[in-house]
Amino acid sequence: MVKMSVARAFALGFVGVVISAGFARAQEDFPFEHELLLDAHPMKGSKRIPILTVEPDGTATIDLWCNSMQAQINVKGEAISISAGEKGSQSCAPERQQADDDLAAALVAVTSWRWDGENLLLIGPKTLRFRQQTN
């Protein structure tokens, strides 16, 4: 009876470790194919918040404060690099255009990423916090 209880406890413990390891691994994976919203308030007079969407092949669409931008993102472990591509030419208020330029510059300066709870941190000279969009 005692041997059976020890064996059962060991089996349950092993299953728990396997499930925990799988969950931890899932938490570490980069969130390809998810819309990631910049953790920021909309600018005055707008409801728009920047959104980052990255495909598994690294192509990305970044909706900035006014325009959108194409990019190529390379993820290797915790390292990440972002190469900016074409940016839209929609006319914007000067402060929104400046915010686009500032965010684009911060994104291309990112060198690593990690999860902080439910938030994705893109880390460079300036840390950018994104959260997965939930509907």
Identify what each model region corresponds to.
Residues 2-12, 20-135:
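Lipid interaction determinants
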